[in-house]
């Protein structure tokens, strides 16, 4: 109805091949593939640099450990006040 059928795509492909020729299309495909490969390589080289960046030199602690440390001084304060 409003979509492009397989036959219409096939006719468009034949027209493109007739206009540009197979050598030119092969060259364009190779150039496009090389560009995509180069882009992927650049992105993969950039990933390890992001993973190595740290904000500080200390080990992350769990929430439970932090709560235990904070709770210990509070209990001492409560005992001293009583």
Curated annotation (Swiss-Prot):
Pfam families noted in UniProt: TatA_B_E (PF02416)
Sequence ranges of Basic and acidic residues compositional bias: 42-82
Entry keyword set: Cell inner membrane, Cell membrane, Membrane, Protein transport, Translocation, Transmembrane, Transmembrane helix, Transport
MF term (GO), any: protein transmembrane transporter activity
Membrane topology: Single-pass membrane protein
Disordered, as annotated region: 41-82
Function: Part of the twin-arginine translocation (Tat) system that transports large folded proteins containing a characteristic twin-arginine motif in their signal peptide across membranes. TatA could form the protein-conducting channel of the Tat system.
Subunit (UniProt): The Tat system comprises two distinct complexes: a TatABC complex, containing multiple copies of TatA, TatB and TatC subunits, and a separate TatA complex, containing only TatA subunits. Substrates initially bind to the TatABC complex, which probably triggers association of the separate TatA complex to form the active translocon.
Name under which the protein is recorded: Sec-independent protein translocase protein TatA
Species the sequence originates in: Vibrio campbellii (strain ATCC BAA-1116)
